[in-house]
């Protein structure tokens, strides 16, 4: 790879190309990344170590190089995000869950260029509660809340129903709002690539918030749903029916 590529990949926040902008790898550097004798594609150890240090999966380059034999490879928006070559201002999502007596709490967190996005899921005997923390700084949070007309969650780009009337609130430097979930909604959230938390602006055309992909870090919370099932009582519709033998 040439110096420009190394500089780009070495950035903490890497934006994917939009509009007429393009990012690519040129011929002389592609040859050094391809294994000529076997026809297979590989990433040299020094390059792989650099990519790993930058938080990038070397396997992304392997797939990219294997997709074409051209002397110039252009990368599009979707490819760069899927292969984690670009993060568009968001560092990798993390999830933390440690089973303990009492409510089961799962936390998703992601550092972004202008703050932090955090989601907590709490399973208690009263039910499942989903809470969003949109940290954008005290001044910005106050500005957004002054224009807020409502807040909502999405799973797979669909608003979580039923709609809630509760307004978002300010907690330190974060915009915070919560809502209850059913166990079915919890299962959908844990397995989705797109879960969103949004605040509506009063002009109706703008919303503020973030999305995360819980399923991408599913190995960090094994057993969470099963633990919740043990904590949250079944609704009458879910509980197994008891069959009483008729009197003889």
Give the ranges of each region predicted by the language model:
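Residue-level marker of positions within ordered structural domains that often coincide
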Residues: 12-13, 56, 85, 194
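Functionally engaged cysteine thiol sites
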Residues: 1-7, 41-42, 122-128, 228
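Charged, glycine-interspersed solvent-exposed loop segments at helix/strand-loop junctions
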Residues: 24-98
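Charged, low-complexity, helix-prone segments enriched in Lys/Glu/Asp/Gln
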Residues: 14, 44-48, 220-228
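Short secondary-structure transition/capping segments
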Residues: 10-16, 45, 69-74, 102-118
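A generic "folded-domain core" signal
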Residues: 89-248
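Glycine-rich beta-to-alpha active-site loop
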Residues: 1-30
């Amino acid at each position: 790879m040439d110096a420009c590529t190394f500089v780009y990949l070495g950035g903490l926040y890497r934006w994917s190309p939009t509009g007429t902008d393009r990012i690519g790898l040129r011929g002389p550097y592609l040859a050094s990344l391809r294994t000529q004798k076997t026809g297979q594609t590989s990433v040299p150890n020094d390059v792989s170590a650099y990519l790993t240090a930058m938080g990038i999966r070397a396997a992304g380059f392997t797939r990219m190089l294997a997709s074409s034999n051209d002397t110039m490879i252009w990368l599009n928006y979707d490819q760069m995000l899927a292969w984690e070559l670009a993060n568009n201002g968001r560092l990798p999502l993390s999830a933390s869950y440690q089973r303990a007596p009492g409510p089961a709490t799962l936390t998703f967190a992601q550092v972004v260029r202008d703050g932090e996005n955090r989601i907590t899921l709490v399973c208690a005997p009263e039910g499942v509660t989903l809470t969003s923390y949109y940290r954008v700084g005290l001044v910005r949070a106050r500005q957004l809340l002054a224009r807020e007309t409502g807040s909502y969650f999405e799973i797979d780009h669909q608003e979580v129903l039923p709609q809630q009337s509760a307004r978002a609130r300010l907690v330190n430097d974060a915009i915070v709002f919560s809502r209850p979930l059913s166990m079915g909604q919890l299962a959908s959230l844990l397995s989705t690539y797109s879960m969103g938390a949004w605040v509506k602006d009063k002009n109706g055309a703008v919303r503020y918030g973030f999305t995360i992909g819980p399923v991408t870090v599913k190995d960090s919370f094994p057993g969470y749903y099963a633990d919740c099932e043990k904590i949250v009582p079944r609704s009458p519709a879910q509980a197994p029916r008891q069959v009483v033998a008729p009197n003889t």
